[in-house]
């Protein structure tokens, strides 16, 4: 089962490494990881997406709470949350493909953020199924 775990941890060198090392040492997989400072510049928020049974997630949570840098651990999966995915895709766009890629970006409410002679870089935001549908449509 997919779980999203949110951590508050001290914003200091090596804190990220220790959290990732804990996952690696115990054979847990991190599917997605986001880290950013909070309004309190001494703290960072880390959001981790992982898979595991409730027992495995409980073990992960216990291990994370033992790390000195970790201030708070919350399994967001237990409550209501909104999940969005940001996708950057570089696509070939030559000749007639250029107009087709512009049209596809519009249909999926994406933005062209970079243009070269032979390609576009597109930015799409949405749920996983929307972004997957875009990839299938341009394939």
Where do the model's predicted regions map?
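A conserved regulatory-domain signal marking ACT and ACT-like small-molecule sensing domains
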Residues: 1-139
